[in-house]
């Protein structure tokens, strides 16, 4: 029996599955994700799933990991200090594509060199100047990024610069041409900088994951999921970590297609913190053709086109009472559900809730608690005296918000401590509402019911209670989540059809459709694609969401671990692109890493380009961990019609090699 171990680090939970291609999921387990150190959560999930299945280490032939580390690091601005060697560019180029913002004050070195669009040198590479500049900055950085003008047409200057830096410093170097074959030098440079910054972080995670495998005696290849859903060997991921951004969402799409057998669908994955909505087309994730955007920076990385909203089972529920008609606001902040907090602190939670229920009118901070985070890795550096004082009081132990804060100013300070990751709030959530309604019962239902009663007693602008008891309030919360989810799904569908715009789903006509209102004109928006719901709570909410958008709803078995399944059922897939140009009439040039070769006949040039692309894609697929890869090739040519004759301008030959990963080494 050969098993695969799939691991996914989500925003709230880290999932692990043991998977057999014939039997499906053999065992699954969850552990809380530890954002400050993902390894802790990974170890917990792996320990639990291996113990529950009682398997032998030798039975595990493949381990695959999807991780939020790269995405989170870029959003939070974390990573190593890097130097960018910018060859053939000028100051104006550095102002484009958010490059200066991405550098965050890290060294930027301008060096003469680069090529023209046909791959001919526009200036000699100034190696002497490069050697001097590298000597100055090397002691202050953890790596280098190198980007040269038109390196996608001729990368020789990037390669020469890389070799010099490695000889001189021994530090890792990322070259732009290795990450993307597309034009746009500044954005390719930005992608290279981000990649170089992530190398240390991803290398550390992979080494730790391999240590966990060794602890269990697992001797198997370790793969990492890319942002397009494909797999790559851990050794490749260490050098190209930027390609792991959005790997978790991509993995969920691969898992969704596998679990359902559906090749075209909208997929919505609801977790504790967020809901991710995307599309699968022909069994593969629909990719963002413009490159993935993370932390406000648009990269040149092919990754899943994903819409993410701060809406999950653990979203904070706030009742907005300033309007004549009160509304429920969900998220975007994640909090600890009352039903979960009561499991760890039953006396505190029930005593406080019971006391608050005796008070009338209800307080603004009813059903809200503060939990200190003592092992979150967050720093208290930079707090002012009042914030530091509030933090010290919070660190004493769990408390009600009402007891901790000493005035309105403290409420703002508490919010800042939460954003810094120093404390967490426990409050009423959709998870609590589901406990009250009996749809999901895993924790303390009594605490959830008391919290719902307190929330229902809040007063509207007219002075009346916002809901008639715990059940009515909980139904209101669940309906609000379902409505928000349906709006997000509709917006993704409309974007696919070319109708984009924030809040488009709240247009009066679409609102009428979602509310089921009809008159002389019957307005009914309907998804033509199936809607696949993923996540531990998808079965609770998504039958209703599918009904709202008039779609065929599908919630597969093991929807709660689809991401981890996607990590092991995916394929290795790599692309190799060879460019062709016509520098002058009758001379056709093949642009390749080793040399630029000219031909007098276009057909011969295409044959050579095809051969090179096939061989290179097979080699790279093998390095990425594929076994018995298959190759397909696409040609794309641009021509101009001049004087009644078609004139070849340029073209590409792209080979794609794909195969399942090799099993036990």
Predicted regions and their residues:
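N-terminally biased helix-coil "hinge/interface" segments that flank
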Residues: 1-665
């Amino acid at each position: 029996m050969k098993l695969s171990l799939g691991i996914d680090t989500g925003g709230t939970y880290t999932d692990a599955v043991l998977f057999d291609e014939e039997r499906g999921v053999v065992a699954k387990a969850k552990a809380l994700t530890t954002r400050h150190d993902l390894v802790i959560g990974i170890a917990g999930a792996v320990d639990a799933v291996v113990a529950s299945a009682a398997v032998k280490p030798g039975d595990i032939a493949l381990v695959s990991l999807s991780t939020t580390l790269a995405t989170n690091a870029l959003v939070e601005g974390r990573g190593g200090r890097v130097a960018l060697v910018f060859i053939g560019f000028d100051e104006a180029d550095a102002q484009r594509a958010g490059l200066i913002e991405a550098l965050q004050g890290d060294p930027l070195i301008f060096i003469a060199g680069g090529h023209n669009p046909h791959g001919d040198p526009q200036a000699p590479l100034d190696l002497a100047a490069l050697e001097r500049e590298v000597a100055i900055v090397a002691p202050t950085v953890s790596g280098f990024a190198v980007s040269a003008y038109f390196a996608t047409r001729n990368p020789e200057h990037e390669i020469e610069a890389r070799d010099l830096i490695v000889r001189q410093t021994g530090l890792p170097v990322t070259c732009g041409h290795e990450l993307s074959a597309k034009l746009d030098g500044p954005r390719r440079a930005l992608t290279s900088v981000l990649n170089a910054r992530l190398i240390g972080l991803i290398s550390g995670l992979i080494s730790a994951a391999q240590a966990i495998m060794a602890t269990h005696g697992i001797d198997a290849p370790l793969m990492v999921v890319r942002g397009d859903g494909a797999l790559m060997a851990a050794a490749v991921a260490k050098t190209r970590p930027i390609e792991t951004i959005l790997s978790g969402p991509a993995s969920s799409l691969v898992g969704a297609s596998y679990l359902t057998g559906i090749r075209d669908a909208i997929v919505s994955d609801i977790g504790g913190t967020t809901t991710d909505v995307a599309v699968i087309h022909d069994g593969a994730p629909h990719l963002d053709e413009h490159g993935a955007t993370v932390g406000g920076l648009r990269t040149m990385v092919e990754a899943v086109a994903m819409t993410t909203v701060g809406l999950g089972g653990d979203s904070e529920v706030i009742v907005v009472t300033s309007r004549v008609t009160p509304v429920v606001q969900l998220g975007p902040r994640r909090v600890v559900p009352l039903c979960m907090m009561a499991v760890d602190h039953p006396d505190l939670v029930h005593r406080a809730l019971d006391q608050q229920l005796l008070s009338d009118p209800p307080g603004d901070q009813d059903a809200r608690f503060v939990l200190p985070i003592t092992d979150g890795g967050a720093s208290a550096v930079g707090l002012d005296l009042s914030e530091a004082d509030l933090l010290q009081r919070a660190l004493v132990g769990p408390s009600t918000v009402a007891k901790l804060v000493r005035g309105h100013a403290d409420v703002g300070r508490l919010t800042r401590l939460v954003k810094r990751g120093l404390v967490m709030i426990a409050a009423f959530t959709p998870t609590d509402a589901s406990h009250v309604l009996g749809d999901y019962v895993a924790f303390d239902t009594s605490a959830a019911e008391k919290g719902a009663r307190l929330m229902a007693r809040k007063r509207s602008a007219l002075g009346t209670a916002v809901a008639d008891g715990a059940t009515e309030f909980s139904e209101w919360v669940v309906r609000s989540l379902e409505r928000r989810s349906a709006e997000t799904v509709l917006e993704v569908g409309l974007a696919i059809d070319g109708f984009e715009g924030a809040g488009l789903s709240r247009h009066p006509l679409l609102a009428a459709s979602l509310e089921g209102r009809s008159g002389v004109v019957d307005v009914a928006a309907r998804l033509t694609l199936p809607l696949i719901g993923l996540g531990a709570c998808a079965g609770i909410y998504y039958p209703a969401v599918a009904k709202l958008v008039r779609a065929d709803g599908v919630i597969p078995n093991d929807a709660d671990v689809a991401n981890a399944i996607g990590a092991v059922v995916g394929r290795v897939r790599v692309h190799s692109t060879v460019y062709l140009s016509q520098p002058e009439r009758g001379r056709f040039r093949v642009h390749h890493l080793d040399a630029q070769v000219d031909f007098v006949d276009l057909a011969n040039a295409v044959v050579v380009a095809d051969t090179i692309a096939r061989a290179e894609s097979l080699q790279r697929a093998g390095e990425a961990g594929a076994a018995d890869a298959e190759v397909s090739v696409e040609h794309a040519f641009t021509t101009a019609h001049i004087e009644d004759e078609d004139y070849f301008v340029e073209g590409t030959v792209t080979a794609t090699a794909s195969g399942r990963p090799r099993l036990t080494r």
